[in-house]
UniProtKB/Swiss-Prot annotation:
Name of the encoding gene: mutS
Organism of this sequence: Parvibaculum lavamentivorans (strain DS-1 / DSM 13023 / NCIMB 13966)
Pfam families cross-referenced by the UniProt entry: MutS_I (PF01624), MutS_II (PF05188), MutS_III (PF05192), MutS_IV (PF05190), MutS_V (PF00488)
Entry GO CC: cytosol
UniProt KW Nucleotide-binding keyword: yes
Function: This protein is involved in the repair of mismatches in DNA. It is possible that it carries out the mismatch recognition step. This protein has a weak ATPase activity.
Protein name per UniProt: DNA mismatch repair protein MutS
Similarity comment text for this entry: Belongs to the DNA mismatch repair MutS family.
Amino acid sequence: MSEPATSFTPEIPSALPSIPADATPMMAQYLEIKARWPEALLFYRMGDFYELFFEDAVAASAALDIALTKRGKHLGEDIPMCGVPVHSHDAYLQRLIRKGFKVAVCEQVEDPAEAKKRGAKSVVARAVARLVTPGTLTEDTLLDARAHNYLAALSRTGAEAGFGLAWVDVSTGDFAVTSLAPVALGAELARLSPGELLLPETLDEDEDLAALLAQSGAALTRLPAIRFESGQAERRLKSHLGVSALDGFGAFARAELGAMGALLDYVELTQVGRMPALMPPRRVAATDTMAIDAATRANLELVRTLQGETAGSLLATMDRTVTGAGARELASRLAAPLTDPAAVNRRLDAVEWFHDARDMRARLRAGLKSAPDIARALSRLSLGRGGPRDLAAIANGLAAAHGLCAALDGASPSLLPLPEEIARECEAMRGTAASLQSRLAAMLAEELPLLARDGGFIARGASPELDETRALRDDARKLIAGLQAKYAGESGIAALKIRHNNVLGYYIEVPPRHGEKLLAPPFSDSYIHRQTMANAMRFTTAELAGLASRIAEAAGRALEIELALFDELAAATLLEAPSLSRAAEALARLDATAALAELAAERRYVRPRLDASFAFDIRGGRHPVVEAALARTGQAFVPNDTSLSAESGGGKHIWLLTGPNMAGKSTFLRQNALIAIMAQMGSFVPADEAHIGVVDRLFSRVGAADDLARGRSTFMVEMVETAAILNQAGERSLVILDEIGRGTATFDGLSIAWATVEHLHGVNKSRALFATHYHELTALSEKLAHLANATMRVKEWQGDVVFLHEVAPGAADRSYGIQVAKLAGLPAPVIARAQSVLAALEEGGNHEARTKLIDDLPLFSATAKPAPAVKVSAAEEELKNLNPDELSPKQALELLYKLKALAAKDGE
């Protein structure tokens, strides 16, 4: 599992070493550049390495576990130094970013030959090309292709009680903003899970807010409050959008403007003056999506398990997408279930169409597999970090979009007409940038380098001038081979070779024993000695130097032409950025929709009926993750019904669920919450039938964990989460509560649970499932008109308990705790003693009975005898050794009679 992003800000010194008069030109340049980026590690390009110096080197060597060396002196002290290779620096960047560092990447911006023209001691010009931070990553090697990487900004103005929260995915251009009440901030941050969060320094004064932000998991970047000033932000936004007024994009609150302005400033800062191709900002209303707080998301294991793993989460169980963009769209839908029934049903219409059109679904998914990630390729091109492969991704993505659109347009007449959701996506793709796609396909070669500077990415025949220059370059290389043969023949040295490196250029190389021959007449007149090595001597000639010059000119000119063509193609692509972004979104949505249809067909899910009622009727509901896990082992999940609807459930919108541990209460609670989320994200659900009235807020208090960092016990955490539910839940909410009040004294816990149920019933009036071991609460069904009792069915057999995992009306008559403890393997004396204590408590419960129990404890009487060794019967021994899969019917019947005889003998 990858390391999570942290809110730790590494200490990088803001006061840097002064530049002494005797500093080398290189070190003087380094210190000058570092002074401009004091809070980041500086990757200083030195040839094929990025080198770090001073405290940067100390911090990086420790974080990366690489060698710390030294290079020269500063003010009489050794300068610490470490470095990483340029060709593999992405891996080191990723590790530093995940440990909370920011990295300023400083590149050489001129050729060393140009620097030498200014003087022998001139240093190559360098400049920071970008600031790499957790929220501004664009490279595929640094990103998860199947997850968004949001940079968010939080703002609050004195005149407004709430917050403005803006977010952008620099790698795709997604840009949005919303206004939030303070109580809703945690839920929204949990939904977005940003990689980095910008906030004004003044917000640190709010201790409760600081604690909430620290829990978000995002790297926190504090900026001067002036960066969030709404007037300045509005001007910045208008300039970015190229408009004189923002009315066409929505009526933004001051806090929203401040957050968006800070985002744009920070993106431009980190990209050193360049801006990615961002979509126009969309304003998201808090009521558009189901509110799910951080605790509920964690308890329900929506995107990762409680152990932090992706496998075993709801997202991993549901994901059938075939593209990275489709996976991101699916994750976004799961994170933000919709609350508008019409919007949800449009999604369900599209899923149903693909569900029924099996052949078209298979054809579409096969076509999508060849669709690259247009959005991320476009972002890299807009930031000047794109390469030939990004242009090819655009071309191939457009080709896939056009092909899929044609396939959908030509769908079989036997199918229903395209639903609105699919027709809209098709319209976004139809004919998009067709001329650009044709041009890119014609210009690009089949085999493409990663970087444009490597050349060779323009197809032969695409540019006559380039073809001519390449021919000259390639012919010159043939002349080199001919010249080598000529020199070998003239000198009689068969081992003579003409080689090339970046220092000497082309040179003649011979073994040392033949070198003396070339140093003596008559060869010394034409062969000029260049270098002596341990195992070779190197020479040149005027003829070779002239030919090398022509080759260099031809090769340089060919690369120059290719780079110019690349710039032309990139510029033409960026002109189509808006339509390309729409096509990329359409492909992602089609992938997510078809994937949900594939899942529904594979797992026998059904379309839920979703409307504006207060219904919550599930027939044959199943837990999607548990069902999938059981299916892998050949087991079946036991389905259960739920009815929390005032309309059809006899007015019972709260169920009080009792039953033993291990009987399936928590699974039942969670499965209903997950079914609600799946339905409102626009997915079919694991049930035989489902009718759900829109849920506006989902609350879950399931499981137990302490919060030692903030001085909170398990019980305190439980009470804080319960308080949030009781203070925020409403009539449209769905509440899942498990074992409220168990972390304190029995009567205290019972009292809290009792009062909580009454409050949910009379004040919140929410649809709720309340699991408890306090059987006394079942009496509330006689007092509260909208509460019903339900229990997990069990059977007892020969003193053991068998869990049926079935929910039935009524209340449990006992908890079966001792039987569960026995299953867990508690020692036999402990089980026996527990049974006797329970019997005594059930008989009376008065003070004298409890005193007698204490007097009977082994501590005050005699040490308990060890449990007798369990004798294994002959029948049990026989059962242990048999393999059912190897028995024929006749053998099985004979064995049955044998076991019966052994059992009878054992019982004597």
